[in-house]
Amino acid sequence: FKQKTAYEIMPSLVGSEMCIRDRNGVRFFNDSKATTPHATVAAVTGFEQVVLIVGGRNKDLDLFELREIAPRLVEVVAIGESAEVLTRVFEGVVPTVVAASMKEAVEYAARAAQKSGGDVVLSPACASFDWYRNYNERGDDFKQIVFSLEREPTDP
């Protein structure tokens, strides 16, 4: 049995659900690989209070399945081609806003999570092809924007 090094393990974590930053008590999770409603439901089930960044190009799947996680959602930030449908999915159930870019989505979600004490989770339930070449590129954009957020005085 050969123990793996961090370098050997790390590539398998890219795009998976993981905490990429804790900023002033708000944790940011990248689950860009979740391209179906089922995957997003599974990811969010482990959280208590989530500001969910969700959307992209729907793969002709039933996005109403996402209502199952509504009790865990503080707010929804809908992005991409499916944003309009997602506002209908959560209408009257969870406050939902539409963001025109990932930057706008992350900045809004960060503010909402700071107020609520929740976590920000990118778990799109959709493909990335409306804005990106693939889910890795979408996840990388999310990470870059999260790390570009201004540090708060209490950040390490």
For each predicted feature, which ranges?
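Single conserved hydrophobic/aromatic residue that forms the stacking wall/gate
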Residues: 1-15, 20
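Nucleotide phosphate-binding/pyrophosphate-handling subdomain across enzymes
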Residues: 16-73, 88
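Short beta-strands and strand-loop turn motifs
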Residues: 23, 121-125
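Residue-level signal for inorganic ion chemistry
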Residues: 31, 52, 76, 122, ...
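Short, active-site-adjacent cap segments at secondary-structure transitions
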Residues: 60, 84-86, 127-131
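C-terminal helical cap/extension that packs against the catalytic core
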Residues: 62-118, 154-156
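Glycine/aspartate-rich loop-and-adjacent alpha/beta segment that forms the canonical ThDP
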Residues: 125-151
